[in-house]
């Protein structure tokens, strides 16, 4: 349970009032983090469902609570949450679990540099990587500015809590893990740039 407390402190320090902890977030529902009790990366997903794909901060679909149904689905639809975090369009990060959940599915980083150096066995991504679901329809690059800022801060909080030295091999897309997926629509360079820019 030590990692949960460390992660909580890091998230609050980085995100302030833009983080909310869901019921049971600190409960270990599956195995501990592999291989050494902390995750080795943060895997990026999009929900493929959202109230809007407008990036206008004043749009009703980008206000807090507008996508509560999506957040509740990630939290409650399966036996364990479908991601560790959901990032709403207003920039709020909802923490579902500090421990391994089911989000990565089958896949492999074999031959995929630099992620092949993480040592994640085939189809075992759930036990090694945190996952964040970004609320987005996923048809185009529609992340809001608030989401990009919070993604950067979330990545830094995960780095702080997990002891990563940097971001080069720590922020893969879901499609980096498996060719079955298209998320996210953003490049690895973009993801890394937000982590560097928004701390």
Task: Explain the meaning of each model-derived region.
Residues 1-123:
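N-terminal catalytic cores of peptidoglycan-degrading enzymes
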């Amino acid at each position: 349970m030590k990692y949960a407390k460390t992660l909580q402190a890091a998230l609050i320090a980085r995100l302030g009032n833009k983080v909310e902890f869901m019921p049971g977030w600190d409960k270990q529902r599956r195995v501990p983090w592999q291989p050494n009790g902390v995750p080795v990366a943060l895997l990026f997903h999009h929900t493929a469902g959202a109230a809007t794909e407008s990036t206008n901060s004043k749009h009703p679909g980008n206000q807090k609570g507008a996508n509560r149904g999506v957040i509740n689905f990630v939290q409650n639809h399966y036996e364990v949450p479908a991601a560790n975090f959901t990032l709403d369009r207003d920039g709020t990060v909802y923490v579902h679990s500090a421990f391994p959940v089911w989000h990565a599915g089958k896949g492999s980083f074999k031959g995929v540099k630099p992620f092949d150096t993480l040592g994640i066995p085939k189809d075992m991504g759930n036990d090694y990587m945190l996952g964040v679901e970004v609320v987005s329809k996923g048809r185009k690059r529609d992340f809001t500015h608030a989401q990009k800022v919070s993604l950067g801060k979330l990545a830094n909080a995960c780095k702080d809590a997990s002891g990563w030295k940097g971001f080069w091999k720590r922020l893969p897309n879901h499609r980096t893990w498996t060719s079955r997926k298209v998320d996210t629509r953003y490049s690895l360079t973009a993801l890394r740039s937000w982590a560097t820019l928004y701390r």
